[in-house]
Amino acid sequence: MQNLFSGLIKASRRSLYFPFSLGHFANDFVPCSVVVLAPAIALEMGLNPMEVGLLLTLHSLGSALGYFPSGLMADSVRNRGNLLMLTFWWVGLGYLIASWAPGFWSLAFLFALAGCGDAAWHPLATAILVQADPQNRGQALGFHAIGGTLSAVIGPVIVGFLLASMDWRETLHWIILPTLLVGILFLQIRKWVPEQPERKAISKEDFQHLWKSWTKKTGLLIICLISSYHMSLVALMSMIPLYLREFHGLSSAITGFAFGMMVLFGAFMQPLMGRFSDRVGRRRVIVFGIATAAVCAFMIPVLENFGLLMMIIIFLLVGVGLLEGIRSSVLAAAVEYTGSREGTTLGFAFTLMDGLGAFGALLAGWAAGIQFSHAFLLAGILCTFSLILCFSVSLRS
């Protein structure tokens, strides 16, 4: 046993894939579970679908504020291990305080504040990984994404079972424990993170270069692609727990399990699709994922008319899994477009995804308020728009 543990430690020292994937899992565990907590919060506070969508949107918008500053620090701070370690305590303590929120607006504010800590992790960790393995950016981002996607699988399942025996506030107290425990582990792991050979303080010229890159036609098209892609993913995912609970009458435990399985596919597809896009090009992989997800989304109202619940769950699983699966390819395409300042570029891309992309939850909540199946039609329309943009922009392999 001691030899096995020593071997794991040595392997972790050689590669940051596992510790960073573990860190991603721990940091995302609570934020990914909020969507399953939402029906219980709505029941206690008397929220309608539109207000649930607004809560999820504000949660993501607040989180998005942490991405870009973190990206800047990823490119300029010498010792990034300490910053990574601090994110766990920010997230854990932040959501603990949020569990005591008395009303909707205080809860939305505290969720957003806690989410900033989770957001800060992403540009820091991903910048370190793509700088360490520049020839396999898609694969590196995919391995990092496994942890986050697994948290979106395991978190909702655990939350679903916990909600069967306690309220959402007590549930929140339990699910912050993995974050705090990994925060303790990172007191040691932070020492494994290589320091940057030299400080690369971002200058006025760097900002001008980034501004010039992103305001060109190609840059603007990529911005629209990233935003619409993530809006379609958020629109598809945000209403699924409420849809299964309220419309189909499934229990919290079954809802959490079904939602977890829907993103399990994406957990294992991200490194595979990322590596595949490293070999055959970003566009082919992204087009395949978005096109298939669009078909799945448009099929939900049809299947609903026939009362085929199991088929609905299968189509949602495929749609969510493939949209999650191409995330690393989309991020790698953004890094390759600018060609430098990986942390800043990734921070900008994450801001677009969780900032502008967060409006997918608000729009889906509005559509679901009319009829639940309309939320999935909206996701299909957003996928179609993303598909058009993908054919309009040149993506390097």
Tell what function each PLM region has.
Residues 120-133, 324-338:
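Intracellular juxtamembrane helix-capping segments at the cytosolic ends
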Residues 65-102, 277-280:
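Conserved MFS/SLC helix-loop-helix module at the cytosolic interface between two early adjacent transmembrane helices
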Residues 340-370:
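A late C-terminal transmembrane helix in Major Facilitator Superfamily
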Residues 110-148:
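Cytoplasmic helix-loop-helix junction between adjacent transmembrane helices
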Residues 1-11, 193-222:
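Juxtamembrane intracellular "pre-TM" segments in multi-pass secondary transporters
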Residues 34-35, 218-264:
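Extracytoplasmic gate region of multi-pass secondary transporters
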Residues 144-191:
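Helix-loop-helix hairpin linking two adjacent transmembrane segments in secondary transporters
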Residues 283-330:
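C-terminal transmembrane helical hairpin of 12-TM major facilitator-type secondary transporters
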